[in-house]
Amino acid sequence: MSLDSLKSAVPDYAKDLKLNLGSVIGNSDLPAQQLWGTVLATAIASRSPIVLRELEPEAKANLSPEAYSAAKSAAAVMAMNNVFYRTRHLLSDHEYGTLRAGLRMNVIGNPGVDKVDFELWSFAVSAINGCGMCLDSHEQVLRKAGVDRETIQEAFKIAAVVEAVGVTLDAEAVLAAE
């Protein structure tokens, strides 16, 4: 189970995705923890069993136990936050924005890894889940911490490719079962 296995599973009509897997993940300039934490968090967020099954072992091999757990935590807490804050943002009644959230999200304050890495993973998950409010918030925290736009873009490129591969392979699995 690996990036190479996943690339091999991508159908010919989606050759661009196969090439992007190789360039965006296989040849990334991100430090290993940022790269593989982003890969794991976005694989979880993609909701694709195939993608998660193929990428998780390689991510686990490249992350410390703390980073592995933190990347999963980023995917979990952002699954909740992205729905909550996206809904609050999209409602035409802006009074919801003044109400207390009342949701526990302690892991954001104490993720067990470098907070910049956790923010990057949270940002990438937010890209998949489409929460503009969360994207802006995490991007601002990253920029204030000195993270350059190129690094931030790498995270959402990973998110885009992982999501697209998940959609494609899950569709192929359904079509093959017919």
Curated annotation (Swiss-Prot):
Gene Ontology MF term list: alkyl hydroperoxide reductase activity; disulfide oxidoreductase activity; hydroperoxide reductase activity; peroxiredoxin activity
Keyword Magnesium: no
UniProt-annotated catalytic positions: 131 (proton donor), 134 (cysteine sulfenic acid (-soh) intermediate)
Keyword terms: Antioxidant, Disulfide bond, Oxidoreductase, Peroxidase, Redox-active center
Cystine bridges: 131-134
Keyword Oxidoreductase: yes
Domain of life according to the entry: Bacteria
Any one GO biological process: cell redox homeostasis
One Pfam family, short name: CMD
Catalyses which reaction(s): N(6)-[(R)-dihydrolipoyl]-L-lysyl-[lipoyl-carrier protein] + a hydroperoxide = N(6)-[(R)-lipoyl]-L-lysyl-[lipoyl-carrier protein] + an alcohol + H2O
Listed EC numbers: 1.11.1.28
Classification via InterPro entries: AhpD (IPR004674), AhpD-like (IPR029032), AhpD_core (IPR004675), CMD-like (IPR003779)
Family recorded in the similarity comment: Belongs to the AhpD family.
Function summary: Antioxidant protein with alkyl hydroperoxidase activity. Required for the reduction of the AhpC active site cysteine residues and for the regeneration of the AhpC enzyme activity.
Quaternary data: Homotrimer.
Name the UniProt record assigns to this protein: Alkyl hydroperoxide reductase AhpD
Organism name: Streptomyces coelicolor (strain ATCC BAA-471 / A3(2) / M145)
Gene: ahpD
